[in-house]
């Protein structure tokens, strides 16, 4: 599995994350091309900079005839919102992205608005985004989700986040670091406040990248392919860079997941569907039911739930509340999986992504992406199996490329 591990020893911001992606090999022109759908006129200025002896990539989002600003959010209580944008306007812009990227980008902006609305006691629909700062964040957020896809990353991990310390000036006055909205976004994320660095190291955009795009906050065992550095704007006692490792998780690396199982033989069958929905809502990664026979040949259902270890207690509590179970088994599985990469193949119906599985340096499976094939079938008015046939016909091209 190809992963990105973030090492935010000097914090994280939207421009630092974009800089990291470019430093790891993402073509900024491809990001710009993919973001043309937003109908926002902008440019990405990319340059190499030196931060305390570390060469890093700096990416600035620049708009015509407008000064570049650090992204920030203000509420209706602010006296400087004459040219602000509401969340609905931002969502309208981000909705021009393709699925599933737009869903992630919209979730990120909604999280920004929810954090600010909670701090100021407003509904998120009333939160105002400064015009330049808002569009800055739109490009950084959309660029982040597009860049991860271009990097063909399947999972993002992150270490403990350095927020810095001291105070920062906001539209509402002087606040301790991290600023209130940023602190709200950092809930549930492992952080530390470095007292030797008196600066705001995590911006709201950086915090929402961590909140929505990071899958796990731990250090995995990985085989490193590349190390990259995205530069921030400050000159500090430490290099103001976001370090990232691009690599592969070893197939036998423990996932940090738990498997919870319980046998149920006395529950109304109509309740199982609701149980599954609630378990997924609570953060289960997978839920499946297996028909079994218990003692005395009594028919029953084995309920299996896969979740991250941090969700174990919550899942168990829900399982006992929503089912008739009074006990469960908890396993710590070791997952062995093939290394997966995403490639695009050219077919008679256009370019279609495929997932390539390799084990022990040998390709063991090539699988077309179902949703992409389904979309082509619907657009062309042809059977889905015909699209699959075209993909498999072009599969030799992918094998030679891997």
UniProtKB/Swiss-Prot annotation:
Its EC number is 4.99.1.12. It comes from Thermotoga maritima (strain ATCC 43589 / DSM 3109 / JCM 10099 / NBRC 100826 / MSB8). It comes from the Bacteria. It catalyses: Ni(II)-pyridinium-3,5-bisthiocarboxylate mononucleotide = pyridinium-3,5-bisthiocarboxylate mononucleotide + Ni(2+). This is Pyridinium-3,5-bisthiocarboxylic acid mononucleotide nickel insertion protein. Signal peptide: none annotated. Pfam families: Ni_insertion. Belongs to the LarC family. The gene is larC. The lineage of its organism: Bacteria, Thermotogati, Thermotogota, Thermotogae, Thermotogales. GO terms for molecular function: lyase activity; nickel cation binding. It is an enzyme of class 4 (lyase). Involved in the biosynthesis of a nickel-pincer cofactor ((SCS)Ni(II) pincer complex). Binds Ni(2+), and functions in nickel delivery to pyridinium-3,5-bisthiocarboxylic acid mononucleotide (P2TMN), to form the mature cofactor. Is thus probably required for the activation of nickel-pincer cofactor-dependent enzymes. One of its GO terms (biological process) is protein maturation.
